[in-house]
Amino acid sequence: MKAKTITVKLDKCCYDIIIGSDLIAQAALQIKSFFHQKGPHQKRLAIVTDTNVAALHLETLQAGLSANQIHTIPIIVEAGEQSKSFPVLQTIIDKILAARLERGDSIIAFGGGVIGDLGGFAASIIRRGMHFIQMPTTLLAQIDSSIGGKTGINSQYGKNLIGSFYQPQCVITDTCVLDTLPLREFRAGYAEMVKYGLINQPHFFEWLEKNQKEIFSSGPTRVEAIARSCQFKADIVARDEYEAGERALLNLGHTFGHMLETATAYNANRLIHGEAVAIGMILAYQFSAQLNLISPMLVQRVETHLKAAGLPTQLQDIPGELPNAEMLMTFIAQDKKVSNNRLTFILTHGLGQSFIAKDVASDAVLTFLKQKFTKTH
């Protein structure tokens, strides 16, 4: 199958998202073109990856690069959200500086969303900005986090509170790598795909309802779903690179979702990002229904679809105890979307009719969360 190319067009730069099969082995064909742009230069780059991806795919990537006389410095970190931390970031930076990579050299972020965020953030601050390439290996990273330039790490006070906007040179998306992805991780990425339909593409959501089984199987329908999702994300980023307006819609489910990730201390045994987003989207829809913006029937429809994909949708689906509603509210207060101590949520008027709700009353959110806890006990 011929690779698809989607171009992200921004005010100051543009870059391609290349989607196809067996692109890891062929990545050097794309990457070496960036070295030619720099003139005579020893071809060197760092590969930031995690233990899981390294075991499965690093040798294939390095072999292809080596065959094209590109020297690589692999930097392998532990898999999981807990690696999005200052100590791990420091380790990556130290290894890149110790290898004497220059500003004109590149960093490949070869992994899921955690690696993309870590590698991109490191690239943005080392020598005031190195080049970097996204090579996403999870569905979530392929359709969402690798596109748009958001990078960063977590804090004890909340998720993604330390970071930068920093665009890659390109995104190389090998759909074959998804065949080795654990089902739980694929489901988590699917939650972000559903999110795009819920934002402002009701026809896409309906298409997902009809094609969910095919998307979970390797084949052309999966590739189409990935390409459509990437195009949607690319279009929004092109219109609003720094999240001054419309791009905030991409945070549907994320205010509640980040709250839950912080509450579970980023413990993947309890909750991973896409699962948090799935629960967060249902909470956003339930809150919208409580405000009489939508009918409970629509909430049920969306929840039924997420459940059919094997995703959690309720607080009680999270293993272990959660903090009380008051403590959860303190996590929401640290959310990046808070402005002048006013809460901002992405809510909805209907299927594909999401909107940015500013000045949401904190008392209303607290009451809503207390009701959720009452129902779980």
UniProtKB/Swiss-Prot annotation:
Segment forming the signal sequence: none
Pathway assigned to this chain's UniProt record: Metabolic intermediate biosynthesis; chorismate biosynthesis; chorismate from D-erythrose 4-phosphate and phosphoenolpyruvate: step 2/7
Biological process per Gene Ontology, one example term: aromatic amino acid family biosynthetic process
GO cellular component: cytoplasm
Cross-referenced InterPro entries: Dehydroquinate_synthase (IPR050071), DHQ_synth_AroB (IPR016037), DHQ_synth_fam (IPR030963), DHQS/DOIS_N (IPR030960), DHQS_C (IPR056179)
Free-text comment on the cofactor: Binds 1 divalent metal cation per subunit. Can use either Co(2+) or Zn(2+).
Keywords: Amino-acid biosynthesis, Aromatic amino acid biosynthesis, Cobalt, Cytoplasm, Lyase, Metal-binding, NAD, Nucleotide-binding, Zinc
Cofactors that this protein relies on: Co(2+); Zn(2+); NAD(+)
Primary location group: cytoplasm
Source superkingdom: Bacteria
List of residues binding Zn(2+): 192, 254, 273
Entry annotated with the keyword DNA-binding: no
Primary role: Catalyzes the conversion of 3-deoxy-D-arabino-heptulosonate 7-phosphate (DAHP) to dehydroquinate (DHQ).
HAMAP family per UniProt: DHQ_synthase
Protein name, entry field: 3-dehydroquinate synthase
Organism ancestry: Bacteria, Pseudomonadati, Pseudomonadota, Alphaproteobacteria, Hyphomicrobiales
